[in-house]
């Protein structure tokens, strides 16, 4: 009897072991669909000049969850609102860290910032400070006089062009506006007397965006890719940009110590005060390098994104005269006669907000959210996503998903009428600021900049296309790089709106 019982238990154990082994083998095989690649480089050759568009096209064949091999790095790309929800909400804690990337590492003084640092206690404490101190609604509202002053200068500049009948480069105007507002709010000073004038600073920021969006071999071949970066000159370009930014930060610190500034407490004032108070972040005290890394996030995140959105919005409005007429009528009928629209006025401009949402849907400033790194294995659409997988959310593709959006290629702000979808991170159909733990903490600051700048340009001026062009000549080509900016600058002729 004992022998029979022993043999029965042994047989049952063998069956259970075989079933467990088979299940583990099945799990190992449950990888997302993957396009064929080449040895060593994997799928790098399929990225193209505009990776978000290339991967969108691949997702049509291989699905909304797609596995690729970029060099030696296993990478998963998700391209639908449902899979984005699983990544950013349901499995957020499994994959909310960041991969090690050469450009961000150099700019952030070895990951002392909030955008690119890995998920740990240091990051949690830093985010708390940023949310409660730097980007709170109260602090952002304290910068409103700066926005009003700079938008007034923009209105005066465009008015002068209107009186002369000369075209205006709106791409440049919007970039200059966001540079001035961001720098005044961050540093409390203009460029006069600093190591950088406005033009040089804008070029430095442009070059920084360029190398962040450039192919860096060390990001895909950690063991030897740095050699390629040296040979291509990318490493040198990166080092020069970092040194130039560092010199600028140091001069800003000196100006603040001398008290050579005016206005409300800016970001540098706040951070220097926290340094003086010996604020502890993570395992150490706040240092100058911490402050520089945070300032880098403010500059890189604040300057390009708002200008890009305003430029794309004006581009789409010029291509869609019906929408232009409707949004200008709303603004002018609601506001009446004023020298400038205020933030309180903007709360009444519902169609303008729809125009901005529709712009974010078709033209998210960052077509991919900053890549994540998987910290613990999880399942996504029944596929196993292993530890150390690099994960991208293709926001650009989500905005064009026909399963979510009817006629996705049409610019149609009315699709947001009676819709609960907004850009605040709770609706995964629209993710210009991301969602989850790594959502952009400066969302309110960015949104108000776009609303305020765009509303005043639409209120004060009518716009026409330069002589010899038609609406269809205004193209939608995107520039390669970190952000999906308009490749060809938007140049329009302003006409002063006289009824105020």
From Swiss-Prot:
Keywords: Heme, Iron, Membrane, Metal-binding, Monooxygenase, Oxidoreductase, Transmembrane, Transmembrane helix
Compartment annotation: Membrane
UniProt-listed Gene3D superfamilies: Cytochrome P450
EC code(s) of this entry: 1.14.-.-
Lipid bilayer topology: Single-pass membrane protein
UniProt: heme binding residues: 440
Cofactor(s) in the UniProt record: heme
GO molecular function, one term: heme binding
Residues that span the membrane, as ranges: 1-21
Major localization listed first in the record, in broad terms: membrane
UniProt xrefs under Pfam families: p450 (PF00067)
Cellular component terms (Gene Ontology): membrane
Protein family according to the UniProt entry: Belongs to the cytochrome P450 family.
Protein name, UniProt field: Cytochrome P450 71B36
Naturally occurring in which organism (per UniProt): Arabidopsis thaliana (Mouse-ear cress)
Name of encoding gene: CYP71B36
């Amino acid at each position: 009897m004992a022998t029979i019982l022993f043999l029965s238990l042994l047989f049952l154990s063998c069956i259970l072991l075989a079933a467990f082994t088979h299940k583990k083998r099945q799990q190992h095989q449950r990888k997302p669909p993957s396009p064929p690649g080449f040895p060593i480089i994997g799928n790098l050759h399929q990225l193209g000049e505009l990776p978000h568009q290339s991967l969108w096209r691949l997702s049509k064949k291989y699905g909304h969850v797609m596995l690729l091999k970029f060099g030696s790095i296993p990478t998963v790309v998700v391209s639908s609102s449902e899979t984005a929800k699983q990544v950013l909400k349901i499995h957020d804690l499994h994959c909310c860290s960041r991969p090690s990337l050469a450009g961000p590492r150099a700019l952030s003084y070895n990951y002392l910032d909030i955008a690119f640092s890995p998920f740990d206690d240091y990051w949690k404490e830093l985010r708390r400070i940023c949310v409660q101190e730097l980007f709170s609604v109260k602090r952002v509202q304290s910068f409103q006089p700066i926005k009003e002053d700079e938008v007034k200068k923009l209105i005066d500049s465009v008015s002068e062009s209107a009186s002369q009948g000369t075209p205006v480069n709106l791409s440049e105007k919007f970039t200059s506006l966001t540079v001035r507002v961001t720098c005044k709010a961050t540093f409390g000073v203009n460029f006069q007397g600093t190591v950088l004038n406005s033009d040089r600073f804008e070029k430095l920021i442009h070059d920084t965006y360029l190398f962040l969006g450039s192919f860096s071999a060390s990001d895909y071949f950690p063991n030897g890719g740095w050699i390629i970066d040296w040979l291509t000159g990318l490493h040198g370009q990166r080092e020069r940009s970092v040194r130039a930014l560092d010199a600028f930060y140091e001069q800003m610190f000196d100006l603040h110590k001398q008290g050579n500034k005016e206005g409300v407490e800016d970001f540098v004032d706040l951070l220097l005060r926290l340094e003086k108070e010996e604020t502890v972040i993570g395992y150490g005290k706040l240092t100058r390098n911490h402050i520089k890394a945070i300032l880098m996030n403010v500059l890189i995140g604040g300057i390009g994104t708002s200008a890009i959105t305003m430029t794309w919005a004006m581009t789409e409005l010029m291509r869609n005269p019906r929408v232009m007429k409707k949004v200008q009528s709303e603004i002018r009928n609601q506001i009446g006669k004023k020298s400038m629209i205020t933030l309180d006025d903007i709360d009444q401009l519902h169609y303008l907000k729809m125009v901005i949402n529709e712009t974010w849907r078709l033209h998210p400033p960052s077509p991919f959210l900053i890549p994540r790194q998987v910290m613990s294995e999880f399942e996504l659409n029944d596929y196993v996503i292993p530890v150390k997988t690099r994960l991208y959310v293709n926001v650009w593709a989500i905005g064009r998903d026909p399963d979510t959006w009817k006629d996705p290629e049409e610019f149609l702000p009315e699709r947001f009428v009676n819709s609960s979808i907004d850009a605040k991170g709770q609706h995964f159909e629209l993710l210009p600021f991301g969602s989850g733990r790594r959502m952009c903490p400066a969302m309110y600051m960015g949104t108000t900049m776009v609303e305020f700048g765009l509303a005043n340009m639409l209120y004060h001026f009518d716009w026409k296309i330069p002589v010899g062009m038609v609406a269809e000549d205004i193209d939608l080509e995107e520039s390669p790089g970190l952000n999906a900016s308009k490749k060809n600058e938007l140049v329009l002729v302003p006409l002063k709106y006289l009824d105020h």
